[in-house]
Swiss-Prot record:
Identification of the protein by name: Ribosomal RNA large subunit methyltransferase E
Classification via Pfam families: FtsJ
Residues annotated as binding S-adenosyl-L-methionine: G115, W117, D133, D149, D173
Catalytic function, reaction form: uridine(2552) in 23S rRNA + S-adenosyl-L-methionine = 2'-O-methyluridine(2552) in 23S rRNA + S-adenosyl-L-homocysteine + H(+)
EC number: 2.1.1.166
Record key words, sorted: Cytoplasm, Methyltransferase, rRNA processing, S-adenosyl-L-methionine, Transferase
Feature: compositional bias, Polar residues: 26-52
Family: Belongs to the class I-like SAM-binding methyltransferase superfamily. RNA methyltransferase RlmE family.
Compartment(s): Cytoplasm
Gene Ontology MF terms: rRNA (uridine-2'-O-)-methyltransferase activity
Function: Specifically methylates the uridine in position 2552 of 23S rRNA at the 2'-O position of the ribose in the fully assembled 50S ribosomal subunit.
Region (Disordered) residue spans: 1-60
Length: 268
């Protein structure tokens, strides 16, 4: 078993083709019967330390990744509850704090593979959920999944038609394949985040929200300045499910103000 590669919903990245991580055991109704208990299950999960039985034929990096997976309580909880990836708990923890998903919410999930965030959105009562990815994604009960590129000029209108109106939440957990060079990796993920933000501006309803993965670094100041103009609140968060050694953060923007964005563009 090899580590899964990351994925995105845009074809403009020049790196290797993205392959969605192999989905964990999936369930039509993942998580606990009471959705408020989903994150608590992960927090209380405990694994006995497990070691690989054999390292034969595996590189050091593969051994390290496999050992990490075997001893990760979020991986164990995802398998037990039927989430497609441990990343589902990141969105659960973000939503526990910011209350972005509720009954009647229209949601677009950019770079949806393998479907964990889409599952969470449906489980938490969203009215309409559309997941978009360049690569095939197994169906998620209660959501629509399409293959496509979010940079396609026709995509914003297409997804709004599928939702039956503008989106209340655009979320992106997209990440490029990492190179190991911090500056390069940061620039790549910021390019995806900026593209997702531009897409969000085209599809969000007034008062809507935006979530995107970013890496810690210094080149996102222009993006943050634009977000602070277009949204009433912009915050960074590192959910507990995000690995401590990872430099990833999530930017949470709420209260979309399209008129402020229009004023800003006129004054530019």
């Amino acid at each position: 078993m090899k580590p899964p590669r990351s994925r995105s919903g845009s074809s403009k990245d020049t790196g290797p083709k993205r392959i969605p991580g192999k989905a964990l055991k999936s369930a039509s109704n993942p998580g606990e019967n009471d959705a408020t208990l989903d994150s608590a299950t992960a927090r209380t999960a405990r694994n006995k330390t497990v070691s690989l039985r054999t390292a034969r034929g595996r590189t050091t990096a593969q051994q390290r990744w496999l050992n990490r997976q075997l001893n990760d309580p979020y991986v164990a909880a995802a398998r037990k509850q039927g989430w497609r990836s441990r990343a589902a708990f990141k969105l659960i923890e973000i939503d526990d704090r910011f209350k972005l998903i509720g009954e009647g919410t229209r949601i677009i999930d950019l770079g949806a593979a393998p479907g964990g965030w889409t599952q969470v959105a449906v489980k938490r009562g969203a009215k309409h959920v559309v997941g978009l990815d360049l690569l095939p994604v197994d169906p998620v009960a209660g959501a629509e999944i399409i293959e496509g590129d979010f940079t396609d000029p026709e995509m914003p209108d297409r997804l709004k038609d599928m939702l039956g109106g503008p989106a209340d939440l655009v979320m992106s957990d997209m990440a490029p394949n990492t190179t190991g060079h911090a500056a390069t990796d940061h620039m790549r993920i910021m390019g995806l985040a900026e593209g997702a933000l531009d897409f969000a501006f085209q599809v969000l309803a007034e008062g809507g929200s935006f979530i995107a993965k970013v890496f810690q670094g210094g080149s996102e100041k222009d993006m943050l300045a634009l977000m602070k103009t277009a949204f009433s609140s912009v915050k960074h968060v590192k959910p507990p499910a995000s690995r401590k050694e990872s430099s990833e953060l999530y930017v949470i923007a709420t209260g979309f103000r399209p008129e402020r964005l229009l004023e800003s563009s006129k004054g530019a």
